[in-house]
Amino acid sequence: MTDKIRTVQGKVVSDKMDKSFVVAIERTVKHPLYGKFIRRTTKLHVHDENNEAKLGDVVEIQECRPVSKTKSHKLVRVVEKAVA
């Protein structure tokens, strides 16, 4: 059985923790009755072994085994650095 490793992109909204940060992932959902597209945000805690990601960066993350109670994703790469 081959499992596809799920990767997503998001924006770093907090990097105050050691070896971890919080990513906000935005998606659009169509309202069931009115049909208007609404933005929904999901926040995930991500493991960052080398503290590479900084506030405002766009990063690519993937699912992994649970690292702690809230962290079950890890950093793959920094896609775009934040403008300083």
From Swiss-Prot:
Keywords: Ribonucleoprotein, Ribosomal protein, RNA-binding, rRNA-binding. InterPro entries: NA-bd_OB-fold (IPR012340), Ribosomal_uS17 (IPR000266), Ribosomal_uS17_bact/chlr (IPR019984), Ribosomal_uS17_CS (IPR019979). One of its GO terms (cellular component) is cytosolic small ribosomal subunit. Pfam families: Ribosomal_S17 (PF00366). One of its GO terms (biological process) is translation. SUPFAM superfamilies: Nucleic acid-binding proteins. One of its GO terms (molecular function) is rRNA binding. Belongs to the universal ribosomal protein uS17 family. Part of the 30S ribosomal subunit. PANTHER family: 40S RIBOSOMAL PROTEIN S11 FAMILY MEMBER, SMALL RIBOSOMAL SUBUNIT PROTEIN US17M. NCBIfam families: PRK05610.1, uS17_bact. One of the primary rRNA binding proteins, it binds specifically to the 5'-end of 16S ribosomal RNA. This is Small ribosomal subunit protein uS17. It comes from Haemophilus ducreyi (strain 35000HP / ATCC 700724). The gene is rpsQ.
